[in-house]
Amino acid sequence: MELSSLIRETPQLTLRPLRPEDYAAFLSGFRACGPARNRFDDGQFDLSFLTEDWYAGLLARRQREAEADISYVLNLFRREDGASVGYCDITTQQRGDFQWGRIGCTVLNPYWGRGYGTECARALVSLGFRELGFHRLEAHVNLDNPASQRVLTKAGFVREGIRKAFIFENGVWTDNLIYTIIAPDGAESEDACGA
């Protein structure tokens, strides 16, 4: 699928792929970050590697991953002023008889508490079911991350269970809560499902 065709608008956000002309906004979003607020937040970090050449490579890599149906990464732009406030993705877990994807969303810390995460998750569900043809979407969340758990619940996800020792983080295997949402009958795109 052509990555540039995946665009969603929510009341506050535009979710779309990065374009070459977005470099300054992309960089400004990360420059605006304050110190990390919790263990899930990268906060401020060295931005020296975020050169224009690096950025061009990022855009090319994201397009290749979309064409190969590996992942679809979109940036979050605030509609009122075009500020880059985060990014999100839908990653293919398995196609065929499963049509199973995973979503993720990162809102940069200056923009927390404004409902952007919930809007993003809802938009990803719509994209995942309608444009990408997934039947099942899931999200993986640390047990001690109640903010992300609330976002997913507000977006219609249901807590399905816990995967033990699921993700290797900071030198240890961590358990993750699994939240899922299933496409309503007929919601999956027939074209995306190969029908």
State each model region's role.
Residues 1-39, 73-195:
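Acyl-donor (CoA/ACP) binding surface of acyl/acetyltransferases
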Residues 36-60:
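Conserved GNAT-fold acetyl-CoA-binding loop/helix
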Residues 46-47, 59-75:
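A short helix-loop-beta-strand connector motif used in the catalytic cores of GNAT acetyltransferases and
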